[in-house]
Amino acid sequence: MAKMLKFGEDARRSMQVGVDKLADTVKVTLGPKGRNVVLDKKFGSPLITNDGVSIAREIELEDPYENMGAQLVKEVATKTNDVAGDGTTTATLLAQAIIREGLKNVTAGANPMLIRNGIRMAVDKAVEEIKKISKPVEGKEDIARVAAISAADEEIGKLIADAMEKVGNEGVITIEESKSMGTELDVVEGMQFDRGYVSPYMSTDTEKMEAILDTPYILITDKKITNIQEILPILEQIVQAGRKLLIIAEDIEGEAMATLVVNKLRGTFTCVAVKAPGFGDRRKEMLEDIAILTGGTVIAEELGRDLKEVTLDMLGQAESVKVSKDNTVVVNGKGNPENIKDRISQIKAQIEETSSEFDKEKLQERLAKLAGGVAVIKVGAATETELKERKLRIEDALAATKAAVEEGIVPGGGTAYINVIKEVEKLTSDVQDTELGIKIIVKSLEEPLRQIASNAGVEGSVIIEKVKNSEVGTGYDALYGKYVNMIKSGIVDPTKVTRSALQNAASVSATFLTTEAAVAEIPQKEPAMPAPGMGMDGMY
C-alpha cells in the first residue's frame, strides 16, 4: 500500500497538533476544580469521567500525522497507569510541555540528540530529589488522605482506608458494582475459594443453604474419592474425636458421596465435601497453600501418599469453615506462622519474576488469601452514568493508595515538582544544547501547578513564583485558594505516581524531538454505495 511522507519541521508540527489535541482534552480534569469529559460509547450510555487514561484511550484523530502524535502521548498515559495506576493526566500534561518547549529549541537549530541528553540528566536529578522529600505512609489517616485526594471525595478515602486496615497491605481489594444506591465495604476474612459443596444435603443451615463447621479437621487431596473404604479409617478416628470434617478433593462421587450424605442426614457424622479449586498446576499450588494455612498435608498421588494411610496429624485444622453453593471460606487456619511467612515470601518472589499479567494477578490473589483476606468495595449510584464515573474514581484512588504504601508520599498539587526545580537548575553542562535540555525540564516542571491554578480560574505564574519562594512543602490549595503546608493539610500525592509521570513523559517526549521524518498510510476513500434499484424485476 502506498505511503505519505513528511519531513523535518513539517512532520514534527503535524504530530504536535495531535499531541495538543489529546493533552488539551485531558488536562481540563486536573486538580480539585478540574472538570469532567464525556466519552461517547457505541453501546450504552456515555461515560463521564476525569480519568486521564480512559479519556486518552478513546481519542483517535482523522489526520494520520496528528494521530501519530496523539498515540505517542497516549503511551505516556497508559504506561503511567500500568506502573502507578494514577497520575495519567499529569503525565500527559508534562509530555505536552516537554514537546512544546523542546520543539521551540529544535526549530531554532538546536541538536535534538544533545537536548535529549540534557532532558535525561534533569529528569534523573528531579527523581532523586523527589525521593529525598518523600515521607513514608504512616497509618490509616495518611492512606485516607491519599485516596481522598485522588478521588476528590473524602468518603471514598475513608472507605479505602478501612479496607486496607482490614485486609492489610498485601490483601486484595476488589471493586464491584452494587445493586443499591450506596457504596459499601464487604470484607471476607480468611481464605476464600470459588468452590461450593458437592451436594446441597450437606448444608447445616437449611434456611441460608450454608454449611458451617466449627473447629473441623480438613482432608486435602488431589485424588478422586469414589470408594468409602479409602477414607473409612480416618473417618472412624474423626468420629471418635467428636469432630467435623471438610474434604477438599478433585471430586467425590458414587458410594463415598452417598455414605457421607446418609450419615449427615441421620445425624451420625457431619462432613462437607468440596471440589479442589483451580486447574492443573495452579490447583496443586492452591492445595499446598490451603495445607500450609491449616497445618495439614496434601495427600497427593505423585508423592505416593495413600488415603487409607492418612492419620489425624496429616489433616489441617481451622477455627471455622463456611461453605455455600459457590464458595468456601476457611477462617483462622491453624498452620505454623513461620511456614505461612515462608510461603508468602516464595509467592512474592514469583510475582517479581513473572512477566505475564494474568499470572501476576493470580499470584497476587493467592498472596492475599494467605496474608490477610479479600475486601470488596461495592459501588452504588442513582444512575448507570454516575456509577461508571464513581467506579473509575475509586479504581484510581485504590491504585494511588497502593503506590503510596510502596514508595511513600510527597506534597501534592504539583508542589513536589516546584520544590525540586532549585536542585535541577544547579545542573550544568559544557555542551550548550544539553544545557537547553535541562532548561526544558525546569520549565516543564511548573506545568502541573500552572494547570491546577488555571482550572481553578486563577493565574498560574503568580502562584508558581510564590510557591518557589516558600519553604519546601508549602503549596497552593486550589480548592480554598490559599497557601498551606501540603502534607499537614492532607494534600499529598504518592511518590511513585509523581516519579512515574515525569519519567514516562520525558521518555516519550525526548524521543519525539529526535523525529526527522514521518511515514503514514494514504487514507483509502470508501467507494459510494450504489443506489438501490427502483423497479420491480419481471414486471411491465
Curated annotation (Swiss-Prot):
Catalytic activity reported: ATP + H2O + a folded polypeptide = ADP + phosphate + an unfolded polypeptide
Entry GO terms, CC: cytoplasm
Compartment annotation: Cytoplasm
GO MF annotation terms: ATP binding; ATP-dependent protein folding chaperone; isomerase activity; unfolded protein binding
One Pfam family in the UniProt entry: Cpn60_TCP1
EC code(s) of this entry: 5.6.1.7
Lineage: superkingdom: Bacteria
Residue intervals passing through the bilayer: none
InterPro entries found in the cross-reference section: Chaperonin_Cpn60_CS (IPR018370), Cpn60/GroEL (IPR001844), Cpn60/GroEL/TCP-1 (IPR002423), GroEL-like_apical_dom_sf (IPR027409), GROEL-like_equatorial_sf (IPR027413), TCP-1-like_intermed_sf (IPR027410)
Residues that, per the record, bind ATP: 29-32, 86-90, 413, 477-479, 493
Gene Ontology BP annotations: protein refolding
Keywords, comma-separated and alphabetical: ATP-binding, Chaperone, Cytoplasm, Isomerase, Nucleotide-binding
Assembly: Forms a cylinder of 14 subunits composed of two heptameric rings stacked back-to-back. Interacts with the co-chaperonin GroES.
Similarity annotation: Belongs to the chaperonin (HSP60) family.
Database matches in PANTHER family: 60 KDA HEAT SHOCK PROTEIN, MITOCHONDRIAL
Job description of the protein: Together with its co-chaperonin GroES, plays an essential role in assisting protein folding. The GroEL-GroES system forms a nano-cage that allows encapsulation of the non-native substrate proteins and provides a physical environment optimized to promote and accelerate protein folding.
The name this protein goes by in its record: Chaperonin GroEL
Organism in which the protein naturally occurs: Clostridium botulinum (strain Eklund 17B / Type B)
Gene name tied to this protein: groEL
